[in-house]
Amino acid sequence: GGNTECFWKYCV
């Protein structure tokens, strides 16, 4: 937890 940008199932 603590991601800022998520695309589909990939979070960075």
Curated annotation (Swiss-Prot):
GO terms for cellular component: extracellular region. Keywords: Disulfide bond, Hormone, Secreted. GO terms for molecular function: hormone activity. Pfam families: Urotensin_II (PF02083). One of its GO terms (biological process) is regulation of blood pressure. Its main location: secreted. InterPro entries: Urotensin_II (IPR001483). Disulfide bonds join C6-C11. It is found in: Secreted. Belongs to the urotensin-2 family. Urotensin is found in the teleost caudal neurosecretory system. It has a suggested role in osmoregulation and as a corticotropin-releasing factor. This is Urotensin II-beta. It comes from Cyprinus carpio (Common carp).
